[in-house]
Regions:
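N-terminal auxiliary "cap/dimerization" subdomain that precedes the catalytic jelly-roll/cupin core
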Residues: 1-79
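Active-site region of the double-stranded beta-helix
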Residues: 44-155, 163-182
């Protein structure tokens, strides 16, 4: 059985210093962001105010991200989900290696990247797997199983599988790293 507290300690002890400009620069590398990865997962999505994700209109005819289209929505305050990101920096690669060594699982990670203006998160939902969230910068108010708390910069939380959760607000620019343990 996987000890989530030990994994959270690994996440907490791994320094990940990223700023908004870093993520913007990652997204300008358009060939890194296909419409879908070979396994079918979208690389970049926008969370709509209807509570679902949209991605097709963010991509050019060659199926790679159009940064300008994406940036327009980001600047309006829409949350972006940037998937499969644990290879982007040395710190993220180190974190992935540490988590793999502890679990034997190919751990995946996503960024939730946003600024104030639109819906903060998916409506309350749950996953069939555990998630560890690290707030890289900014802060947001979370609810996990009807308990609300403020997740601050460089802090983390565990979202146990089948827990009803959501981000309730985002009043500042924020970058969250979600680590899916599945």
């Amino acid at each position: 059985m996987i000890d989530l507290t030990k994994l959270q300690n690994i996440v907490d002890s791994t320094n990940i210093n990223l700023k908004e400009l870093d993520v913007l620069n990652f997204l300008k590398n358009r060939k890194r962001w296909p419409l879908r990865y070979p396994w079918g997962q979208p690389s970049v999505e926008i969370l709509s105010n209807a509570g679902d994700t949209q991605s097709n209109y963010l991509f050019d005819a060659d199926s790679y991200l159009n940064f300008n289209k994406w940036e327009e929505l980001y600047n309006l305050g829409y949350t972006s989900i940037v998937s499969n990101i644990l290879d982007l920096t040395d710190d993220l690669r180190i974190l992935q290696k540490k988590l793999f060594n502890k679990t034997g699982l190919n751990i995946s990670g996503n960024f939730y990247f946003s600024k104030p203006g639109q819906q903060a998160s998916f409506d309350a939902h749950k996953h069939s797997y555990d998630v560890i969230v690290k707030q890289i910068y900014g802060e947001s108010t979370w609810s996990i199983n009807n308990k609300s708390f403020l997740l601050q910069s460089q802090k983390s939380c565990i979202v146990p599988k089948n827990s009803v959760h959501q981000v309730l607000d985002k009043n500042v620019k924020k970058l969250s790293l979600t680590i899916n343990i599945e």
